[in-house]
């Protein structure tokens, strides 16, 4: 799923909140950080489901931005270590410390049509939302079943880590519609590219 915010499309196809946060740093080298200003972070938190849709996060500032980037880096190091069979104790210590705080307080409220919907008992602070993401990382990293489905995307120029819940766990890409489709297009082009030679010189294919 993607949601447009300015010129950037958020993607939430990694399967977990903490993985989606880590994926915001998974661009190609030299690309701009999508979490480059407070309003982008506020939008991401809402779209990612860290708070109920429609929640106003007017208190998000540069301090929040720094702290969420630090958490993102720690989660990314933990994921890389997990996939490589290594330890990342410094990153683990940071995530555990953030997870120890209380997450946002949830409550059920009446919507306009009378249905109960998820709401918040108080306006969430930075520490509470960091705790929500950090606790998701702790839950993931201590769940043997989930860990068995942890994968690194095989797409070109993509390093997203995702949760493979497909039958047989044979999924190769973070998103079949994005990285998977790119691979299929590239494979099609390779199959139909005319071999180099005199005929190729007469009519070069469109780029």
Regions found by a protein language model. Name each.
Residues 156-161, 177, 182:
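Cys/His-rich metal-chelating microdomains
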Residues 159, 168-169, 183, 190, ...:
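Short, intrinsically disordered low-complexity segments
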Residues 1-152, 159-160, 194-207:
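Short helix-coil boundary/hinge micro-motifs
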